[in-house]
Amino acid sequence: MEVYCCSRAKRHWRRFSFLLRLLALLMFLGTADGQTRSCYRDRDRKLPVRCMPEFENAAYSKPVESNNTCGIPPSEFCVQTGVTSPTKECTFCNASDPLLRHPADYITDIKNDQNRTWWQSETLLVNNPFKPVTLTIDLGKSYDVSYIRIRFRSPRPESMAIYKRTSTDPKEPWTPYQYFSDSCKKTYNVEPMQIVSPENQQVALCTDEFSSISPLTGGNVAFTTLEGRPDNLNFDNSPALQEWVTTSAIRIDLDKMNTFGDEVFGDANVLRSYYFAIIDLAVGGRCKCNGHAANCEKKQLPSGKMELRCICQHNTAGVDCQECKPLYNDRPWARATKDNANVCRSKF
């Protein structure tokens, strides 16, 4: 057991270090002076300030698509214990049974003691030879993303990758965001633990930090978007990092499964114990409004479709407040910063 189980101290340190990184990024992407609820300091709206929507889990209740989900047809799976034994705790996945189904949308639903749900892929008994599994989440609009955290019910993958799209254009190519692997160079042709250079801050890194088979359940995979980026403390003046955190859709590729090596013997119950299962996906961030809105709301388009948009202030317009209103183009549009709200000015 000692071969594959991390020490308790190491697990606690990883959790603690993640919380420290997360706290730093929340303070950085937010406003240290608390100016996020209003776009003006005064009731007369004469003192504009940078404003932002509240920090949220951008993935919550968003639709998820997967190329591989158990239950069609119903299939049996077994709980991984780490011990090869002819007797395993097994049950069924059945997409037509509300109590036995595990669809992809279960990774973004509400989680509590009364709603212990998860998504699950087919087992190695069905997905054999193994083919990578993909999950895609459409956020519905661009967000400034601070972190992504995935909590697994199964052992974490040996290799997985996160990709993103910046815009809502479905034809936009996927951009690599982060790689996780015990074999970074072999699997992704990326050297592990690289240092980001100031000249290229939009580069996906690879780490083996979350690729151990232990714990067998409840393990997290976490990624903070600005960690290790040279200009992370000068975000207002870094267009490269502003684009790097901008995310409208996320793709998770589960490329290699962690096993104990016993699958090579072909035992059916052993193969039934290997699959991917995710309890929860959290995408921490703010609705992207470029510092010109304190809220985002769904608006109905003439077509009847609902669209998430910023409620723009400072005489700005657009889904992300990314432009000036007509007749307010006395100077070029600009993002609001902590020091300057960069209000669009009238020509008259």
Locations of the language-model features?
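Disordered, acidic Ser/Thr/Pro-rich linker "stalks" and the adjacent N-terminal cap
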Residues: 2, 30-140, 183, 194-230
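Cleavable N-terminal signal peptides of Sec/SRP-targeted secreted and luminal proteins
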Residues: 9-34
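Surface-exposed loop/edge segments in extracytoplasmic proteins
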Residues: 117, 169-178
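Short, surface-exposed beta-strand/strand-loop-strand elements in extracellular ectodomains
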Residues: 158-170
